[in-house]
């Protein structure tokens, strides 16, 4: 199955806060996720949501809907887990119906 990567409207603001090295790591991991997004452990409480460790303190959380991989948030560990449900909810309201 071919997956398409999409981004939550707030995601690029998250990227702006990261260092160049962190962004480079994200880009590499994004390609791995695109090839096999289900390889990671499912997040509890988040239907079809998964997490990827970018660094020891930075997490990427994404959501899979059909062939689309929605990048929800990339931020420090605690903030990423605290905010991803809000972004998932807003994504469902705006794009997924």
Model region roles, listed by residue range:
Residues 7-8, 36:
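PIN/NYN-family metal-dependent endoribonuclease catalytic core
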């Amino acid at each position: 199955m071919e997956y398409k990567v999409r981004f939550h409207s707030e995601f690029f603001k998250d990227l702006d806060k990261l260092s160049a090295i962190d962004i480079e790591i994200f880009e590499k991991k994004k390609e791995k996720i695109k090839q096999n997004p289900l390889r990671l452990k499912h997040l509890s409480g988040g239907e079809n949501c998964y997490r990827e460790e970018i660094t020891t303190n930075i997490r990427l959380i994404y959501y899979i809907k059909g062939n689309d991989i929605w990048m929800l948030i990339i931020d420090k560990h605690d903030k990423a887990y605290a905010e991803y449900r809000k972004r998932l909810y807003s994504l469902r309201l705006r794009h997924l119906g």
